[in-house]
Amino acid sequence: MRLLFFTNLSLLLGLLPGTPMAQSVTDQIAEATLAAPEPLRDGARVIVRDTEGRPTILRAGTNSLICEPDGPQPGFGVECYHRSFQPVMDWTYRRLAEGARTYREAYADGGPEADINAGAMQYALIGSTQEDAVATMSIKLPYATADSTGLPTEERSNGPWLMWAGTAAAHIMFSTKPPGVPDESPGR
């Protein structure tokens, strides 16, 4: 009974289990959409995840973009992605809840890649803190290779490159990361 009372109280206050207590729903929506292109922010669906990786809708959307605020993993990370990514993202966050150490490890481990639309976009701001977060964008291109695209497969700090070449998860990466910044922020 007491748990039910506090759960209902947190929902009335605009807070969801597993989300930072200091952030209102309005603040979470503003944070989540930071990675989205400006013209798409107001129409993006915004979701937050509980500790088991299950999504809850904070705001319904009017376009094809889904955005998520920073979660409990170390570091700062917000992301927006085309709605065809949602099954993969749900799977990835379940893997994190089950013990995958980083976002990249959870995502790279497999999952329902086949249903993501070729050409679908994903946008992210990732860093140790919000202040040092760098923007990355990726374009889904299943089974693309260096030969089929003319892109390098080595990470580049300021230019396109092909990540996970030859796999269902292959995608073109664009990063604004300055040279010398580590490949992966903590928890991502």
Residue locations for each model-derived region?
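Positively charged n-region of N-terminal signal peptides that target proteins for export
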Residues: 1-4
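Bacterial N-terminal signal peptides
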Residues: 7-16
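Sec/Tat signal peptide C-region and signal peptidase I cleavage site
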Residues: 18-22
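Primary mode marks residue(s) on the alpha4-beta5-alpha5 output face of response regulator receiver
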Residues: 23-188
